[in-house]
């Protein structure tokens, strides 16, 4: 039977860019540094809308410096829209193991990303 989710990336590879990782953060006036997305699931396969959470470190950046942690955030967004907002791509890449395979990807700086909620304060 066909996969009811439609196409699903299991071994994704993305080309490196030309921006050093420290410049991705250092050039930010104000933004968020997200170190990991977790529990990502498809919401709409044709529009590539995914929902998930940040995990293992989400930080506020001001004046190019990490100034402190923020709570984990929920997102629901089209990955196609996110990729349309790429401002810079790191030259460094990482191999990340996932539930259904692995990905070799650089870090990205996006001009915008849609977060829809946050975890409760502790």
What function would you assign to each model-found segment?
Residues 1-122:
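N-terminal small-residue-enriched
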């Amino acid at each position: 039977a066909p996969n009811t989710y439609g196409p699903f990336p299991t071994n994704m590879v993305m080309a490196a860019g030309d921006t050093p990782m420290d410049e991705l953060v250092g050039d930010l006036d104000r933004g968020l540094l997200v170190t990991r997305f977790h529990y990502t699931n498809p919401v709409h396969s044709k529009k590539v809308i995914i929902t998930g959470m940040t995990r293992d470190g989400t930080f506020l950046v001001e004046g190019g410096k990490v100034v402190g942690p923020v709570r984990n955030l929920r997102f629901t967004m089209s990955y196609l829209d996110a990729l349309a907002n790429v401002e810079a791509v790191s030259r460094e890449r990482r191999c990340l193991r996932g539930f259904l395979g692995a990905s070799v990807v650089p870090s990205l700086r996006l001009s915008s990303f849609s977060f829809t909620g946050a975890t409760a304060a502790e």
